[in-house]
């Protein structure tokens, strides 16, 4: 069989010619229209002209001489014996340049065909995406319905929780009542209740349940029904002008006897009084005056001794324990001859040794100097030998002070024995001395404060008292004139907040405040962190998270942190006394968490929930919300649109809140409520996160559809003869890979990425490296496309020439045997099977395999071996195409096994190219150069083969031709050839080197 290349009679050797890139883009319309018109005049209406018009590309040599190319076959239209002759030619009389131009134009039309196929593919993908969007929309609707049901369930559970909470509170109150019912506190409460009930009952009880007429005029008369409601068995007053006895009796006679009615009405009137007498009677003026006179007379008779002593006794017996101790003290004081008040003070403040020493002296067994000396020695020895939390010097000083106080107490006892100094006078004297000595001294004392930055401030407490009185007055008047619509001024609390940061779960930041001896913030700010970083006035320290306080019927918690030692001067918030709708202010930091900012607005309070029109941002969670007095009202936890969501903590901190401690059986109801709320919180959070995921996926799909809609899709009209499903139309389909696919390709492995990080590259630098690699891959891919579109013509030309020669010989043989006129025969053309493989990833691989006629099964078998069922990882793409005369198979996104793409070559063409880009402001200047070299045929063979007849070798069909293009790896150092043992072929007798030469018997070539 003839080898590739023009053969046969009249064949001319191909001239050296180089086709330029972009040749298919050139157009030369000069004279073409007129030539076509003249050709139609000469050949129009003939079958030969119709066949010529069915070619892909037509070239006019002259009016009577035309060439056409269809697929890989050239056709010629001439005039023979005055008749048009249309026939296929093997070697057309065309120059290489003319052939190159026709081939380039033909490839352009094939590319248009592939664009139509790509358009249909994109339309199909668009329809699939729309179906997917419709499915996701349905799922979203179902999710929203499910969420609505869960919300209804949550509302029902919330209502049930409120009922359980109220019931639990009632049970707690009942339990508390049962505990204190028979105790000391319950007994005192019972006595006080009986006393107050007696007074109130005597105060409100009327004399006789009847009406009293008041001497005032009235324009209206009362009816019997009204009179009955006001006066029958009731103590009330009735204007004399509204009372008409006869009218009332007549109206009453409708129901009972007239005389009985008059008797009932007369009995219901107790008498008549003036308006002033009515007022004195209603307000019990006479009784109040009498009670006051009685108390004054009692005080005058018994002086102040009785009430003062009563208060003294009540304080001493404030509970059961102190009542027993006070009784013992009174007994000891009586036995030892000591005054009760000084002895009580000594027992309260002095060491027990001092009280014992006084009792010993009171018994009369020892003198004052001796008891003072022994007392002094004992206290000092105890201070020296018995350590405690105080410094030894402090303990000795205290011992010395009480050693001096003992003789003073004894001398005072002796002086009081010679004078009349009653108990009430002792109590009053003690109160006056303590008030003057300690109260005024504390009030006028100077306070020194050292700020964290080192500045020292001094002020007197009396000035703070004055300012407090002024502030209270101002707040009172501001409260009185509070009007919605006029925002009041708030006290500055810029120094009362701190910034809180944690590094757990990606890190978070918020605001904290001091309340009592702890710092508080929103629970989600610290999360599960154990340590938080706190910043105040530029000073940063670490604080331990002590726990979380559960908020009743709320989805968040309140985190409690300890106060670091450097932050002991952090100002403390005071709780608001009441929570009601009013203007409030939220104190927080700005977006950069640097400067203090405030939000002011009207707050709506519903139970423990607080809503205010604050458009907050990330980092404001945990901010304190204060009222117009500067007192702590609530805590900010988040925002819904432009409405701040907060929680009122005034009732929460009315008692010490629990911080995740163990619960007793009595708190079982609270535990159930908290567990139910926790379940609702978790289910709601999971539903919300799932809904957000579906929304994100839906938005991504919508964006993909919008991108596809915005993409310009070229839909060209089909031309006659271009619908044939051959590989020329199919192979360009693989070129329609966008640059966006390359910019998403994964070019670095995990090991390479970690190695770059270990070498000190930042994320931005690594991103730049990856982008450069992807850009270079895109340029290499474009170069390969240009090579396939522009430089494959030589190999294709040789293969086409071989097939055309064979067809031409068969046609000539048939013409000679049958003698038929060519214009009456069917057109003969050749269709070939072709494979196309492309895989783009870290390594780009492209391969094209074309087969001669009759090898369709082998092409399909090779296609099935190369294309696997394994999906490519994210960032890599692949396409495989099989073109047969009767079908086209296309597969994308599967891994391709290029190991099976191989043949036994007889010729090898080596290619090398370079692409250079010069960047200019107006655009890039691109240079592409390529060199193709025919490698010399090697002496083949790797093993011995069996001898076969020469005839079978000649009848063996032409092997398929394969083209495989890969990214050229970096050059590796060439090793020196190894010298192996020589061997001799048993068939042909040729000598070759083992493990080095590839040997094939010459008789089989």
Curated annotation (Swiss-Prot):
Low complexity compositional bias, start-end: 941-961
Ranges for region Disordered: 940-984
EC category name: hydrolase
Protein name per the record: Non-structural polyprotein 1A
Gene Ontology cellular component annotations, sorted alphabetically: host cell membrane; membrane
Site (Cleavage): 204-205, 478-479, 717-718, 730-731, 809-810
Any Pfam family the entry gives: Astro_VPg
Annotated family: Belongs to the astroviridae polyprotein 1A family.
Organism: Avian nephritis virus 1 (ANV-1)
Positions of the catalytic residues: 524, 556, 621
Modification type O-(5'-phospho-RNA)-tyrosine: residues: 753
Lineage of the species this protein comes from: Viruses, Riboviria, Orthornavirae, Pisuviricota, Stelpaviricetes
EC number(s) from the headed UniProt entry: 3.4.21.-
Keyword Cytoplasm applies: no
